């Protein structure tokens, strides 16, 4: 969590190991050719979804949902029995994303609509009707004890194969849990073709995963993000009021990376309703998702971002990306 005193949890724990419990979470690495070159083929090219990262933790026959930072996600009973049934008698953790399927639709809602509802689950304000719209796509399965330990040595190919088998046993009628769309690729060229195909269809991209990769509580070098646009999560350190017709509304947010090295003002991407609403709220210290074209030096010689655009407030995160993870 953010300690509100100029240091984060990881810094405190470097001084006194284990002082503050940290929630386990394996992250993907942003695209770097040197990392991609180390991927062993055949590998998995999996569709990158636009939902909310979550864990379904099944223990002692009960299920709870947590965000990537360990905050409880309230779904008012939705999906609990489904995950308990999938787990059987095993204590385990399902890793994936929550998505929203609106009534009458046969496809998932767009990111803004879906995450608007999912953020309510994160805040504990979701209604039963909204919770019933939530579905899950999953891509990993980790034994509970190894999840808590922060390391599972079983290769991803074995973990995912087990997950595929148990998810496939669900009845087709009314199912709400799905395996992530996944393709086994023999070469990097095949992965790039799938990536370009998804972009053309309006999806975000792929995660390329090495089948030999272990699960570990850190940023993995065996799971690589391929994205059409660059994206990062920054901390809001200040806000600016709009000018002219935008007086009395949010004009821009001033953001920084976790280490304060990357700094940028983000003024585009907000609609009028958001500008009015956010000006009433205390946005300072919140985490925000920003898309951009490239990392640059500004006129003052500081690291910044070219063409930054607001995407959403990340209520599921407490800590921004470090500058080394912003390409």
Regions inferred by a protein language model and the residue ranges of each:
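Amphipathic alpha-helical
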Residues: 7-26, 178-230
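Covalent nucleotidyltransferase
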Residues: 38-175
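Structural detector for short beta-strands of small beta-barrel domains
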Residues: 229-244
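Short, acidic/hydrophobic/Gly-rich beta-strand patch recurrent on exposed beta strands
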Residues: 252-258, 267
């Amino acid at each position: 969590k953010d300690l509100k005193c100029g240091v984060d949890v990881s810094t405190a724990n470097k001084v006194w190991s284990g002082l503050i419990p940290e929630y386990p979470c394996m992250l993907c690495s942003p695209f770097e050719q040197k990392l991609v070159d180390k991927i062993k083929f055949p590998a998995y090219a999996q569709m990158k979804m636009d939902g909310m990262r979550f864990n379904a933790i099944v223990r002692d026959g009960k299920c709870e949902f947590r965000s990537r930072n360990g905050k409880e996600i309230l779904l008012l009973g939705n999906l609990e029995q489904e995950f308990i049934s999938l787990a059987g008698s095993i204590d385990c953790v399902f890793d994936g994303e929550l998505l929203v399927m609106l009534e009458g639709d046969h496809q998932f809602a767009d990111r803004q609509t879906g995450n608007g509802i999912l953020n309510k689950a994160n805040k504990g304000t979701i209604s039963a009707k909204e919770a019933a719209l939530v579905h899950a796509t999953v891509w990993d399965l980790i034994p509970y004890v190894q999840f808590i330990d922060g390391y599972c040595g079983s290769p991803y190919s074995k973990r995912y194969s087990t997950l595929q088998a148990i998810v496939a046993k669900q009845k087709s009628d009314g199912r709400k849990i799905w395996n992530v769309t996944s393709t086994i690729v023999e070469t990097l060229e095949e992965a790039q073709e799938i990536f370009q195909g998804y972009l053309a269809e309006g999806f975000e991209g792929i995660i390329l995963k090495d089948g030999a990769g272990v699960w570990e509580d850190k940023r993995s070098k065996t799971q690589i993000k391929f994205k059409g646009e660059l994206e990062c999560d920054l901390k809001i350190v200040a806000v600016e009021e709009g000018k002219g017709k935008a007086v009395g509304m949010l004009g821009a947010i001033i953001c920084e990376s976790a280490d304060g090295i990357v700094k940028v003002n983000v003024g585009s991407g907000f609609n009028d309703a958001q500008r009015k609403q956010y000006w009433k709220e205390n946005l300072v210290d919140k985490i925000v998702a920003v898309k951009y074209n490239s990392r640059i030096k500004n006129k003052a010689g500081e690291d910044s971002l070219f063409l930054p655009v607001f995407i959403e407030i990340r209520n599921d995160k407490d800590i921004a990306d470090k500058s080394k993870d912003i390409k």
